[in-house]
């Protein structure tokens, strides 16, 4: 394709007509390296590999500057498809975190389903058994001007997740959902998957050492390649425009969970074969960027070149080479294996698991080889259509983006004290951002595989016991608050980390690792890039300062993640949304607790003082229609002490329930502990300071409300004080109403059934 000698305007026009999204300067850079005009197929390959989605060209420098990715428990950091941390000397947990935002806004069902499909492949290709997923979701205002579209998107996304996940047989054990007008035109569908693998059975997503010298085979398995998902990574690296919606539908992939299920079982046989033979293979899923991305990255990661013959692909029709290279057809993996295993591998997929009869055209095919040269070469019908330096293709391009603080001029509102706090409580319990998520997770098979210990909605984190002969469990939580990010991207990032860790601690698990999915607007806009940079700085500071328990001054490592830019439309960008997942390890699952109250007469304690921090709170936004300015901040030593106190108290079996304080503040936290129990509460906030009662009740400063077993209160206070905390006894669990008093005056008295009805119906009504 002509590049050299064209004026910028001519070149840009030529690129767009060909369906290529790169800039004229990027095309010129490619031509300069090659010393010639690139072929059309080469430009398509570079367009995918140099996209924001694949290359991290705007974000990589910031991530490297700030994020802590190493720690004493890290086995594999964020260099391949998933991160790995140790559980003990034998077992490891594998985790990956991705986004599928743009596809889910255009085709909600297919977009969400393929998001789940892609993330479980990322974990499986490390040799792991996939044991759970999580789904942090962000939708527009269900009562706003785009309510019909918002509800259509939300319903489609939930359907896509449960239809794919249930058919695949992987439980959803965690997730959250936030509704805000800023997501009207850009929903966020982030997905997390975790798996388990023995340390000595980990498989890497790279060409193994010696594979180039020995000419290892490259084997493609799964669905026949078609044109579905073509340009998906380019589509994900641009701003959504309503007038282009129909044209973008082709960039959304088509899922097939039943084929995926068979592939996972066949992969187990592959892993068994590899162990028996004592050989190392490379294994990688085909996601964004398709065949070109998977094959070139595997070759480059191993320090080798790659030769691919497109005529040997199993395909679903006639397609030009550029389509075969970058189409994002789902349910595919790539294997790099010794030639002597070729026939055994082909037999596993084509005969033992009979892929051609599971899905028309599906199979395993040898499509190329690893080489010792440094080129990425693709042939089609006997001709070279791609011949480029492999490290140049995979190395991407880097931009030093300009950043400039966004000035919002936010102020604290002067609101009056509500006359009827009962009404305020009921309205907040019914808010779509607080109400029970049962309307969503009732569709999910949360107990498939039989490993689930704590299901979604029962506690702040999900918990499963994936290894039957072991006592340990794996906890998972996901968190982010875009309303905090709107006020302060830095504290939005820090609070997301802190809350994710609190949620894991609330069941008694010890935070072990973090992942991030960073959802922001256009990085070419200085204010948007500043928001991104500040959020990363905030979450990194929290990870560094909250520490791995038992390892002072060691950060909680961030081992996997994703950056999703261009989450904006002509109406504007989404609020800064760094979504954090936290994995925790529970050494003895029999000691885990939930959030529901257990015994009348038990003491209720508050950990964490209340501050005048209602900026971005549900109280300000829902009741008064304002944002505020005093966003919750993370006081790192205090936060660390609260988390450690709860973990130790659960381990000593003196806590019966715990719930972290976040959306809605202490009052909503305490009321939610009644929702799944037959108990009420009687608490008094007289000893909490001089702030006005509504601020004490609804401030979203971090903390916990915990139920302490009768007779164990002194021991609990002793644990807390060992961490320099002064827990406050709020009151006790009762058999009556939800009561909150101050200085002899009853502030709140709610019938638990009335409160439960508001809480259980809020999300159902919003999505009706």
Curated annotation (Swiss-Prot):
<feature type="binding site">
    <location>
        <position position="253"/>
    </location>
    <ligand>
        <name>substrate</name>
    </ligand>
</feature>
<feature type="binding site">
    <location>
        <position position="121"/>
    </location>
    <ligand>
        <name>substrate</name>
    </ligand>
</feature>
<feature type="binding site">
    <location>
        <position position="564"/>
    </location>
    <ligand>
        <name>substrate</name>
    </ligand>
</feature>
<comment type="function">
    <text>Part of the phosphoribosylformylglycinamidine synthase complex involved in the purines biosynthetic pathway. Catalyzes the ATP-dependent conversion of formylglycinamide ribonucleotide (FGAR) and glutamine to yield formylglycinamidine ribonucleotide (FGAM) and glutamate. The FGAM synthase complex is composed of three subunits. PurQ produces an ammonia molecule by converting glutamine to glutamate. PurL transfers the ammonia molecule to FGAR to form FGAM in an ATP-dependent manner.</text>
</comment>
<dbReference type="InterPro" id="IPR010918">
    <property type="entry name" value="PurM-like_C_dom"/>
</dbReference>
<dbReference type="GO" id="GO:0005524">
    <property type="term" value="F:ATP binding"/>
</dbReference>
<dbReference type="GO" id="GO:0005737">
    <property type="term" value="C:cytoplasm"/>
</dbReference>
<feature type="binding site">
    <location>
        <position position="516"/>
    </location>
    <ligand>
        <name>ATP</name>
    </ligand>
</feature>
<feature type="binding site">
    <location>
        <position position="56"/>
    </location>
    <ligand>
        <name>ATP</name>
    </ligand>
</feature>
<dbReference type="InterPro" id="IPR036921">
    <property type="entry name" value="PurM-like_N_sf"/>
</dbReference>
<keyword id="KW-0963">Cytoplasm</keyword>
<feature type="active site" description="Proton acceptor">
    <location>
        <position position="100"/>
    </location>
</feature>
<feature type="binding site">
    <location>
        <position position="98"/>
    </location>
    <ligand>
        <name>Mg(2+) 1</name>
    </ligand>
</feature>
<feature type="active site">
    <location>
        <position position="53"/>
    </location>
</feature>
<comment type="similarity">
    <text>Belongs to the FGAMS family.</text>
</comment>
<keyword id="KW-0460">Magnesium</keyword>
<dbReference type="GO" id="GO:0004642">
    <property type="term" value="F:phosphoribosylformylglycinamidine synthase activity"/>
</dbReference>
<comment type="subunit">
    <text>Monomer. Part of the FGAM synthase complex composed of 1 PurL, 1 PurQ and 2 PurS subunits.</text>
</comment>
<keyword id="KW-0479">Metal-binding</keyword>
<feature type="binding site">
    <location>
        <position position="562"/>
    </location>
    <ligand>
        <name>Mg(2+) 1</name>
    </ligand>
</feature>
<dbReference type="GO" id="GO:0006189">
    <property type="term" value="P:'de novo' IMP biosynthetic process"/>
</dbReference>
<keyword id="KW-0067">ATP-binding</keyword>
<keyword id="KW-0436">Ligase</keyword>
<dbReference type="Pfam" id="PF18072">
    <property type="entry name" value="FGAR-AT_linker"/>
</dbReference>
<dbReference type="Pfam" id="PF02769">
    <property type="entry name" value="AIRS_C"/>
</dbReference>
<dbReference type="InterPro" id="IPR041609">
    <property type="entry name" value="PurL_linker"/>
</dbReference>
<feature type="binding site">
    <location>
        <position position="285"/>
    </location>
    <ligand>
        <name>Mg(2+) 2</name>
    </ligand>
</feature>
<feature type="binding site">
    <location>
        <begin position="99"/>
        <end position="102"/>
    </location>
    <ligand>
        <name>substrate</name>
    </ligand>
</feature>
<comment type="pathway">
    <text>Purine metabolism; IMP biosynthesis via de novo pathway; 5-amino-1-(5-phospho-D-ribosyl)imidazole from N(2)-formyl-N(1)-(5-phospho-D-ribosyl)glycinamide: step 1/2.</text>
</comment>
<dbReference type="InterPro" id="IPR010074">
    <property type="entry name" value="PRibForGlyAmidine_synth_PurL"/>
</dbReference>
<dbReference type="InterPro" id="IPR036676">
    <property type="entry name" value="PurM-like_C_sf"/>
</dbReference>
<feature type="binding site">
    <location>
        <begin position="328"/>
        <end position="330"/>
    </location>
    <ligand>
        <name>substrate</name>
    </ligand>
</feature>
<dbReference type="GO" id="GO:0000287">
    <property type="term" value="F:magnesium ion binding"/>
</dbReference>
<dbReference type="InterPro" id="IPR016188">
    <property type="entry name" value="PurM-like_N"/>
</dbReference>
<feature type="binding site">
    <location>
        <position position="122"/>
    </location>
    <ligand>
        <name>Mg(2+) 2</name>
    </ligand>
</feature>
<protein>
    <recommendedName>
        <fullName>Phosphoribosylformylglycinamidine synthase subunit PurL</fullName>
        <ecNumber>6.3.5.3</ecNumber>
    </recommendedName>
</protein>
<keyword id="KW-0547">Nucleotide-binding</keyword>
<dbReference type="Pfam" id="PF00586">
    <property type="entry name" value="AIRS"/>
</dbReference>
<feature type="binding site">
    <location>
        <position position="561"/>
    </location>
    <ligand>
        <name>ATP</name>
    </ligand>
</feature>
<keyword id="KW-0658">Purine biosynthesis</keyword>
């Amino acid at each position: 394709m002509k590049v050299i000698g064209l004026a910028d305007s001519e070149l840009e026009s030529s690129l767009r007509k060909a369906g290529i999204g790169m800039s004229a300067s990027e095309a010129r850079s490619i031509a300069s390296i090659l010393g010639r005009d690139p072929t059309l197929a080469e430009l398509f390959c570079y367009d995918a590999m140099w996209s924001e989605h694949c290359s991290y060209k705007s974000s990589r420098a910031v991530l490297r500057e700030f994020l802590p990715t190493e720690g004493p428990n890290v086995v594999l950091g964020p260099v391949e498809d998933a991160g790995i941390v140790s559980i003990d000397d034998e077992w490891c947990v594998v985790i990956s975190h991705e986004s599928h935002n743009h596809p889910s806004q255009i085709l909600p069902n297919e977009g969400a389903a393929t998001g789940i499909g892609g993330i479980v492949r990322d974990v499986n290709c490390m040799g792991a058994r996939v044991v759970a997923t999580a789904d942090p979701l962000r939708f527009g205002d269900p009562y706003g001007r785009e309510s019909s579209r918002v509800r259509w998107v939300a319903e489609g996304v939930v359907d896509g997740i449960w239809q794919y996940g249930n058919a695949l047989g992987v439980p959803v054990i965690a997730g959250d959902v936030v509704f805000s007008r800023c997501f009207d035109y850009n929903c966020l569908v982030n997905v997390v998957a975790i798996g388990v693998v023995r340390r000595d059975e980990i498989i890497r997503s790279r060409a193994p050492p010696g594979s180039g010298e020995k000419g290892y085979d490259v084997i493609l398995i799964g669905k026949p390649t078609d044109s579905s998902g073509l340009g998906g990574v380019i589509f994900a690296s641009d701003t959504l425009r309503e007038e282009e919606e129909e044209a973008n539908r082709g960039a959304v992939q088509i899922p097939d969970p039943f084929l995926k299920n068979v592939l996972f079982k066949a992969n187990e046989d592959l892993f068994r074969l590899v162990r028996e033979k004592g050989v190392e293979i490379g294994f990688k899923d085909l996601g964004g960027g398709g065949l070109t991305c998977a094959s070139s990255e595997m070759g480059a990661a191993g320090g080798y070149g790659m030769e691919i013959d497109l005529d040997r692909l199993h395909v679903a029709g006639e397609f030009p080479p550029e389509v075969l290279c970058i189409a994002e057809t789902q349910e595919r993996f790539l294997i790099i294996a010794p030639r002597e295993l070729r026939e055994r591998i082909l037999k596993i997929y084509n005969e033992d698991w009979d892929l051609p009869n599971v899905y028309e055209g599906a199979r395993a095919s040898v499509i190329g080889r690893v080489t010792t040269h440094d080129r990425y070469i693709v042939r089609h019908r006997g001709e070279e259509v791609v011949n480029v330096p492999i490290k140049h293709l995979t190395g991407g391009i880097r931009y030093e983006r300009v950043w400039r603080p966004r000035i919002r001029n936010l102020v604290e509102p002067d609101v009056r004290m509500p006359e009827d706090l009962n009404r305020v409580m009921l309205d907040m319990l019914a808010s779509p951002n607080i109400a029970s998520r049962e309307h969503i997770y009732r569709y999910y098979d949360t107990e498939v595989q039989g490993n689930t210990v704590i299901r979604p909605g029962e506690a702040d984190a999900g918990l499963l016991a994936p290894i039957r002969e072991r006592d340990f469990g794996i906890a998972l939580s996901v968190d982010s608050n875009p309303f905090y990010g709107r006020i302060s991207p830095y504290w939005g990032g820090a609070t997301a980390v802190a809350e994710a860790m609190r949620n894991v601690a609330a069941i008694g698990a010890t935070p072990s690792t973090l992942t991030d999915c960073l959802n922001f607007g256009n990085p070419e806009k200085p204010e948007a890039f500043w928001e991104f940079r500040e959020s990363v700085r905030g979450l990194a500071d929290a990870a560094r300062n909250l520490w791995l328990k038992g390892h002072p001054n060691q950060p909680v490592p961030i081992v996997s993640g994703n950056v999703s830019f261009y989450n904006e439309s002509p109406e504007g960008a989404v609020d800064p949304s760094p979504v954090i997942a936290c994995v925790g390890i529970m050494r003895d699952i029999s000691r885990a607790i939930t959030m529901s109250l257990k015994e009348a007469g038990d003491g209720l304690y508050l950990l964490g003082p209340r501050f005048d921090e209602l900026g971005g709170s549900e109280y300000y936004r829902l009741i008064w229609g304002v944002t505020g300015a005093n966003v919750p901040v993370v006081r790192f030593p205090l936060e660390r002490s609260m988390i450690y106190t709860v973990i130790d108290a659960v381990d000593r079996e003196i806590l019966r329930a715990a719930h972290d304080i976040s959306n809605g503040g202490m009052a909503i936290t305490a009321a939610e502990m009644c929702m799944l129990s037959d108990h009420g509460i009687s608490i008094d906030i007289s000893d909490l300071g001089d702030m006005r009662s509504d601020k004490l009740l609804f401030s979203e400063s971090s903390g916990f409300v915990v139920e302490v077993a009768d007779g164990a209160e002194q021991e609990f206070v002793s644990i807390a004080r060992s961490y320099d905390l002064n827990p406050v006894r709020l009151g006790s669990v009762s058999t009556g109403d939800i009561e909150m008093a101050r200085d002899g005056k009853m502030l709140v008295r709610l019938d638990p059934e009335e409160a439960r009805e508001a809480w259980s119906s809020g999300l159902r009504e919003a999505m009706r």
